[in-house]
């Protein structure tokens, strides 16, 4: 399977940079020259500064309108660069990594997603977005809600990562994001690395594309890992990966259309009876009743690793909370704005104009009404 990871904005390029570390094909797009220079693993010729004529290379200060305009202005440059990387080989999936709460990522990613769908109709466009932390305040929440709406119209799937679920207590925002980015890449890279790999029962690119072609709905990744020597019930470990504690989004899995499960570990632990017991349970839970699976026995492994992907999700508390908060704020803000305008009008209504208070030059027949020249002389 061929995938191209495209990082957009500060958050997105940091995530893409970690994908580059584990040998994925990547490209970075940002409005901040400094953020692009900070990257460690994406080659310099694949780092593109966009919107320089608007921002001077200093970023958009979390303003999605500027992020959108920056992407629009330099979209021909971006698409040419992507075309030079893609060449004549098909790309199965474009993964766009970004932060829902930022400016360049939130504003620019929907623009790029739409352009990629038009240019490469046989490829999937999947957005991988980090939802903002509660501590970041209202502005990132509003950015996220609007971006969710826009991406749902152009992307095949939106893999939303709820940072609030992954953040460990006591972490500040900076260190929390660093850990979260590593977690996102580790889990998704683990899944992609197993596609088209020989196994007892394998997943291929068409399986993954089928699961992710989900009409702009949400998808989430689940994960569970344990020391093989301590696994007493493999079925329970698999189920843990798609229950709330294992998922990266607070979602109702019963609303999912499709599922995909990849299991990797020593052969003596990967018992077929345990695996099918767990998969039968998952099949009974999700609405679409379609589960793709891959089993990868490896005698060199000491751990059992389970990666789950659920797609076609329309019920998520994480998403619903963001959208509801943004709507409530919008109503409150518009009401406050209307009240402020009304009070301003009430306060200032009835004031005279200057012409009502001071006689005009024409009315006095003088070039110096009211003796202003004399006043200026005295003031000296």
UniProtKB/Swiss-Prot annotation:
Region of interest (Disordered), ranges: 359-380
PROSITE patterns per record: TUBULIN (PS00227)
Short name of any one Pfam family annotated for the protein: CetZ_C
GO CC annotations, alphabetized: cell division site; cytoplasm; microtubule
Keyword GTP-binding: yes
UniProt: GTP binding residues: 10-14, 103-105, 136, 163, 181
GO biological process: cell division; microtubule-based process; regulation of cell shape
GO terms for MF: GTP binding; GTPase activity
Keywords (A to Z) from UniProt: Cell shape, Cytoplasm, GTP-binding, Nucleotide-binding
SUPFAM superfamilies, per the entry: Tubulin nucleotide-binding domain-like
InterPro entries linked to this entry: CetZ (IPR032907), CetZ_C (IPR048737), FtsZ/CetZ (IPR045061), Tubulin/FtsZ_GTPase_sf (IPR036525), Tubulin_CS (IPR017975), Tubulin_FtsZ_GTPase (IPR003008)
Subcellular location(s) of the protein: Cytoplasm
Family membership noted in the UniProt record: Belongs to the CetZ family.
Function: Involved in cell shape control.
Protein name: Tubulin-like protein CetZ
Organism: Thermococcus kodakarensis (strain ATCC BAA-918 / JCM 12380 / KOD1) (Pyrococcus kodakaraensis (strain KOD1))
Organism placement in taxonomy: Archaea, Methanobacteriati, Methanobacteriota, Thermococci, Thermococcales
